[in-house]
Curated annotation (Swiss-Prot):
This is LexA repressor. The keyword DNA repair applies. It is an enzyme of class 3 (hydrolase). GO terms for cellular component: protein-DNA complex. The keyword Membrane does not apply. It catalyses: Hydrolysis of Ala-|-Gly bond in repressor LexA. InterPro entries: LexA, LexA-like, LexA/Signal_pep-like_sf, LexA_DNA-bd_dom, LexA_repressor, Peptidase_S24_LexA, Peptidase_S24_S26A/B/C, WH-like_DNA-bd_sf. It holds the Pfam family Peptidase_S24. Belongs to the peptidase S24 family.
Length: 209
């Protein structure tokens, strides 16, 4: 869960207090009146922001259609325990930047050796021959200390990929584990390559999603 802004926290606290007092969430108009918004539409925008941050759920077609999903939105540390799941990675941004985190999963990092630092959603079938399938969650230990033959999470220019590493002089080859995919050749003299970590385990997609 991303942290709430002060205004979002006020809206969340109002919703929770109204449910505690009356058993029902407030309407958009009631939120606007209580917090001094100019219109119910302003309250709606704050509710949408809270829904995106996964602290409430909005029920379409109901004026009081608001469900609270967490007991205490301010308790960010508790909400964000577990391994972060990384989704799409924006160009030029660190892989663990907050905007890349889709969710947190209650997985013990120490069950992997070395221990996992994050999960990466796998896209495509390029590593299927070693059991890394489309939609799986790849457990990754964040390090740049890698050896030939290890399966790595690499960033080539601005594209993130999972491949087996081979270094040859000033060139790096990123090999797929699927004969339908050609190796990715990286000339370190002309291209940017960043190793984000090594694969330390796989969680089958259907187990968690």
């Amino acid at each position: 869960m991303k942290p709430l802004t002060p205004r979002q926290q006020e809206v969340f606290d109002l919703i929770k207090s109204k449910i505690d007092e009356t058993g029902m969430p407030p309407t958009r108009a009631e939120i606007a009146k209580e917090l001094g918004f100019r219109s119910a539409n302003a309250a709606e925008e704050h509710l949408k922001a809270l829904a995106r941050k996964q602290v409430i759920e909005m029920v379409p077609g109901a004026s009081r259609g608001i469900r609270i999903l967490v007991d205490n939105a301010a308790n960010e540390e508790e909400a964000e325990t577990g391994l972060p799941l990384i989704g799409r990675v924006a160009a030029g941004e660190p892989i663990l930047a907050q905007e890349h985190v889709e969710a947190h999963y209650q997985v013990d990092p120490s069950m992997f050796r070395p221990q996992a630092d994050f999960l990466l959603r796998v896209h495509g079938e390029s590593m299927k021959n070693i059991g890394i399938l489309d939609g799986d969650l790849l457990a990754v230990h964040k390090t740049q200390d890698v050896r030939n033959g290890q399966v790595v999470v690499a960033r080539v220019e601005d594209d993130v990929t999972v491949k087996r590493l081979e270094r040859k002089g000033s060139k790096v080859f990123l090999h797929a584990e699927n004969e339908e995919f050609a190796p990715i050749e990286v000339d370190l003299a002309a291209q940017s390559l960043t190793i984000e970590g090594i694969a330390v385990g796989v969680i089958r997609n259907s187990t968690w999603m």
